[in-house]
Amino acid sequence: MFGYNADAIVTPCEPGVVRRVLSWSDEMMMCEISFEKGAKGNFHHHPHEQITYVAEGSFSFTIDGETKTVNKGDSVYMPPNAEHGVTCLEGGKLVDVFHPKREDFLRK
């Protein structure tokens, strides 16, 4: 029921990117992704629905070929299997929610 920051699963991703798995259930998962300015989340796709909230900073998101800039307080929806990637324009943090949970994020 409660997710504690001290218990987060921390994983370095691409250069300048760190993922923290904060909380999950059988059906969903929440992660915090920290980015240094200029860092990229490489293009990928997955069968999960994803909603991303910009907690800090500014980012350029591309989803299925459409690119938009999003800033603190904005959000982004990625449907299942959408090809997407991100570039950090101003150092910041994203909060990702996945449905269903990302089993691959729980493996060490």
Segments and roles (model prediction):
Residues K40-G41, S60, V76, P80-G85:
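Histidine-centered metal-chelating micro-motifs
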Residues P80-D104:
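Ligand-binding loop in jelly-roll beta-barrel domains
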